[in-house]
Amino acid sequence: MCRIAGALRTLLPLLAALLQASVEASGEIALCKTGFPEDVYSAVLSKDVHEGQPLLNVKFSNCNGKRKVQYESSEPADFKVDEDGMVYAVRSFPLSSEHAKFLIYAQEEETQEKWQVAVKLSLKPTLTEESVKESAEVEEIVFPRQFSKHSGHLQRQKRDWVIPPINLPENSRGPFPQELVRIRSDRDKNLSLRYSVTGPGADQPPTGIFIINPISGQLSVTKPLDREQIARFHLRAHAVDINGNQVENPIDIVINVIDMNDNRPEFLHQVWNGTVPEGSKPGTYVMTVTAIDADDPNALNGMLRYRILSQAPSTPSPNMFTINNETGDIITVAAGLDREKVQQYTLIIQATDMEGNPTYGLSNTATAIITVTDVNDNPPEFTAMTFYGEVPENRVDVIVANLTVTDKDQPHTPAWNAVYRISGGDPTGRFAIQTDPNSNDGLVTVVKPIDFETNRMFVLTVAAENQVPLAKGIQHPPQSTATVSVTVIDVNENPYFAPNPKIIRQEEGLHAGTMLTTFTAQDPDRYMQQNIRYTKLSDPANWLKIDPVNGQITTIAVLDRESPNVKNNIYNATFLASDNGIPPMSGTGTLQIYLLDINDNAPQVLPQEAETCETPDPNSINITALDYDIDPNAGPFAFDLPLSPVTIKRNWTITRLNGDFAQLNLKIKFLEAGIYEVPIIITDSGNPPKSNISILRVKVCQCDSNGDCTDVDRIVGAGLGTGAIIAILLCIIILLILVLMFVVWMKRRDKERQAKQLLIDPEDDVRDNILKYDEEGGGEEDQDYDLSQLQQPDTVEPDAIKPVGIRRMDERPIHAEPQYPVRSAAPHPGDIGDFINEGLKAADNDPTAPPYDSLLVFDYEGSGSTAGSLSSLNSSSSGGEQDYDYLNDWGPRFKKLADMYGGGDD
């Protein structure tokens, strides 16, 4: 039986190839027919169709290849066809009977000829246990036969077989290993073959799931499979001889893991949150809950269905919401959502696989919390019909009245926040209403000054609204409008000048006492009987005065346009007007006097200093004129030289270049270097003209080849004369003398320090300072000593050269003084050690001076000592005569010890 099946598998591809060749041959002979080659196109789909999913391709035969065809679907809301004939889903929907069949139209653009074809959609069949068993009964897979050269003719080799997949259910209980199929080659009759499989699950991770008997070719599975981990295994079977040579081409073996319902649905979130506006109509979308199942989504094991288990609270209806059992969309099914009554609903949602079968399906639950959001279904209402307030005149940013409202909507939301609008009583826009964000009150504020003399009272009409419009069907009640009565309080206002500033035109040069104008102010308080007095506030040049009663302005000095206080021909003066109200108020006004120019300033030469060479060439001096007046009292100017002194015109000449410039040149061939003052007559063009003799200071200097003054001349020209140079030298000499005197003083001071003696005068008793050696406790008894003697002990002179009058006060010994070797001088006489050595030397030479031997007891250890005479003690090395003559060098204090060991009489 297995061999017959193998033969059929071998013949089937051959028959299919022959059939295809015959069809192609017949097609070439048959005539081409324009239109759809099929009457009905079929497609097998899963239950759910997704948006944009390609379904099938309808073929249209276009014989001449030049016709342009447009496709159209009979169900354009669900299906569309592109220009290549590919049919796509327009939207996502579950496949049902109403979508099972539709038409596709093809219309030619030129002739408008139209064709149609039917499309039939069917559901993909679900695998059952019987089909799984049937697929599992495949017992033997035979390697396809290979053809080769035979009888000298080259025959076509047949293609490899396509082995049908092996379907194996997951979670099988065994026993293991469980045999699946037997793989063999029909060449096993003549050869001893060995079989093996490769691929993931065999020799690749995860390894060891599938094994094969190398002798019999029996393929087995070693443990249960999990489709959620690996849904398909792709193995390759091999057949080799005992030498390892390949006998057959490898074949592909596909093992499909059949899904079992072993996974519960799992919600993406355990708690879902959604919102719905209050007052929503039935059918309003709320939210979508989603659960996933790890099982095959194309099988019943992964097809989920949703339902609502419970709703809390159950008012106003226990079924306020429903859920789409396939998509999980939650919508409203009843009216009556009111946030002011119920603000939140809690739903328990269940998801069940096996298309919701309560008997075989697995279930899981989640919680959906639906919050009822507020809409503007409650308008704001004023707490009173009329509000009152008052404001002083001319005040801005003042709160006049506080408007209060009530609103039942959710606080601090656009449906609760109030917006106030003035609908009447304020045509000029002097008031505004701002909303307090915390209390929702309306604050009536003055934004423009109010004049009591113009308006004494305002009656405003105010309307209250929300930031968002009211819900449909809700109207504003009369309580949403109120009246605000505002009373204006009269206050004393500032007097004001009109016009301000006031501009007048006057010629400069007016004499003192001239009345210029009257500058008066007005009092806006018409209902107050008040007097105004005037004072001068600012008069930079002190030219004016004002009458305190009538405001007449009179000059007290000559007006000068050229004054630095005049800017752009205008002089500014400020005056103050004050009333006698309570409290008194004042206002300022500015008087601007535009001064007309008169010819009161004579021109001056510019520049006032210049330099030129001793010879006329190559330099000339260009000059101009400076006139503080303006046209026509300024240029053009006339330049000339005076007749006196005669040397001016003899040495110089002036040439007028234009109305503003002239040129001064040397008239003689050589002029000695020096400073010359050249008078120049300059006349302006005023009426009458004004002349002036202006002095030009000219420096004549020696010039180089470029016509520039040399450095010596520039130094002279800079004003550094002989006197200045002498003064500088004297300062330098004095400074050097001071430095020299300081150096001499420092040298003398050092010599005085060196001349000081370490031992002071006889009348000063210093024995405590230099002869007390054994003091170890307490501080110094004598603090009165010269510290410099310790710092500079090198100034102490030897005894042989002590000056007369300085001697020791110690008592001289009664016997002759011994002679001691003179110690070498210290290498550093400035050290304090030299000071101590000198004192020690003096003490050694005078043994009778204190401290005395009877007082310097260093080895007293207390009475009652058991030790005998120290002369009886011998050292460890006293084995013979030793030389103790060196004790004589230790001084008179060790004389007795030297006599004891040296053999003296004592």
UniProtKB/Swiss-Prot annotation:
Biological processes per GO annotation: adherens junction organization; calcium-dependent cell-cell adhesion via plasma membrane cell adhesion molecules; cell migration; cell morphogenesis; cell-cell adhesion; cell-cell adhesion mediated by cadherin; cell-cell junction assembly; glial cell differentiation
Database matches in InterPro entries: Cadherin, Cadherin-like_dom, Cadherin-like_sf, Cadherin_CS, Cadherin_pro_dom, Cadherin_Y-type_LIR, Catenin-bd_sf
Membrane disposition: Single-pass type I membrane protein
Cadherin domain: residues covered: 160-267, 268-382, 383-497, 498-603, 604-710
PTM comment text: Cleaved by MMP24. Ectodomain cleavage leads to the generation of a soluble 90 kDa N-terminal soluble fragment and a 45 kDa membrane-bound C-terminal fragment 1 (CTF1), which is further cleaved by gamma-secretase into a 35 kDa. Cleavage in neural stem cells by MMP24 affects CDH2-mediated anchorage of neural stem cells to ependymocytes in the adult subependymal zone, leading to modulate neural stem cell quiescence. May be phosphorylated by OBSCN.
Residues modified to Phosphoserine: S96, S135
Region (Disordered): 863-884
Glycosylation sites: N190, N273, N325, N402, N572, N622, N651, N692
Pfam families cross-referenced by the UniProt entry: CADH_Y-type_LIR (PF01049), Cadherin (PF00028), Cadherin_pro (PF08758)
Residues spanning the signal sequence: 1-25
Extracellular topological intervals: 160-724
Keyword Calcium belongs to the record: yes
This protein's GO CC annotations: adherens junction; apical part of cell; catenin complex; cell junction; cell surface; cell-cell junction; cytoplasm; desmosome
Family annotation (SMART domains): CA (SM00112), Cadherin_pro (SM01055)
Amino acids binding Ca(2+) 3: N261, N263, D293, N301, D353
Amino-acid positions noted as binding Ca(2+) 1 in the UniProt annotation, renumbered to this chain: E170, D226, E228, D262
Domain of life: Eukaryota
Gene3D superfamilies: Cadherins (2.60.40.60), TCF3-CBD (Catenin binding domain) (4.10.900.10)
Residue spans of biased composition, Low complexity class: 863-880
Record text about domains: Three calcium ions are usually bound at the interface of each cadherin domain and rigidify the connections, imparting a strong curvature to the full-length ectodomain. Calcium-binding sites are occupied sequentially in the order of site 3, then site 2 and site 1.
Subunit structure: Homodimer (via extracellular region). Can also form heterodimers with other cadherins (via extracellular region). Dimerization occurs in trans, i.e. with a cadherin chain from another cell. Interacts with CDCP1. Interacts with PCDH8; this complex may also include TAOK2. The interaction with PCDH8 may lead to internalization through TAOK2/p38 MAPK pathway. Identified in a complex containing FGFR4, NCAM1, CDH2, PLCG1, FRS2, SRC, SHC1, GAP43 and CTTN. May interact with OBSCN (via protein kinase domain 2). Interacts with FBXO45.
Protein name stated in the entry: Cadherin-2
Organism from which the protein derives: Pongo abelii
Record lineage: Eukaryota, Metazoa, Chordata, Craniata, Vertebrata
Gene: CDH2
